[in-house]
A protein has these predicted regions:
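An amphipathic, hydrophobic-aromatic interaction surface with interspersed Lys/Arg
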Residues: 1-202, 207-224
Length: 224
């Protein structure tokens, strides 16, 4: 990071908030806490416009998030992208109206000149939220682990499931897309558990179920 590129009070405040999540004092300089539930960059000012990001709430031991299913899927699919695509990721996360993928692409030009440090901070925040969802909550069974240098294919599976749920009668595609992401993941989790149970009941062994679902045998045993 180059300190001279950090300009403006808002940029410094956001960086300070994110620094609380970075473990660097007397420890490995490269170790970052990228697994937490918090919205550390709730607003972003670009020119004369104020953009509000998604919200995360954990009151009463209940997790909610304002992101819609399609909004989360689009943003998750961009994690690990090149710096040039970060304005699109930010446009998705800070979209001001009813979300559409097309609208986010149009809005992305608004964020092209935003300080790269801020764009990366927003990306880190969303990455940490996603990591928490798929490693520290009941949604961990949706996280398909591959080799360490292979990005999990969950975003592809989630996108396909939009149409599967619509075909199952849960509503048209637009209704499913606008569903709150936590509700959407809850349905996917339920469907996956039902599939594992059904495969077990027809006599498939654990290895076969693992091959078909991508779940570890340990996870399958926990479900059954």
């Amino acid at each position: 990071m180059e300190p001279q590129k950090i300009k403006g009070i808002t940029a410094r405040e956001n960086l300070y908030l994110l620094s609380a999540q970075i473990d660097f004092i007397f420890k490995d300089m490269n170790v970052i806490n990228n697994c937490f539930l918090a919205q550390l960059v709730p607003t972003l000012i670009v020119g004369n416009r104020l953009f509000s990001s998604y919200t995360i709430h954990t009151d009463f031991e209940t997790l909610t998030c304002s992101l819609t299913a399609i909004q989360f899927i689009d943003a998750y699919g961009l994690l690990g992208c090149s710096v040039e695509k970060l304005p699109l990721l930010v446009a998705i996360l800070y979209y001001p109206e009813k979300y559409t993928s097309e609208g986010a692409h149009m809005l992305s030009q608004t964020f092209v000149d935003v300080d790269p440090v801020i764009l990366q901070a927003i990306t880190l925040n969303f990455q940490a939220f996603s990591n928490y969802l798929f490693t520290r909550t009941r949604f961990n069974i949706l996280y398909l682990k591959k080799s360490k240098d292979h990005k999990p294919s969950i975003s592809i599976g989630m996108a396909e499931s939009l149409y599967n749920l619509s075909a199952d009668g849960l509503g048209d595609v637009d209704v499913i897309e606008q569903m709150p992401v936590i509700k959407y993941l809850t349905i996917l989790r339920k469907k996956l558990i039902e599939s594992v149970t059904a495969m077990n009941e027809v006599g498939l062994d654990l290895v076969e179920i693992s091959d078909k679902t991508g779940l570890s045998i340990k996870m399958i045993k926990m479900i059954l």
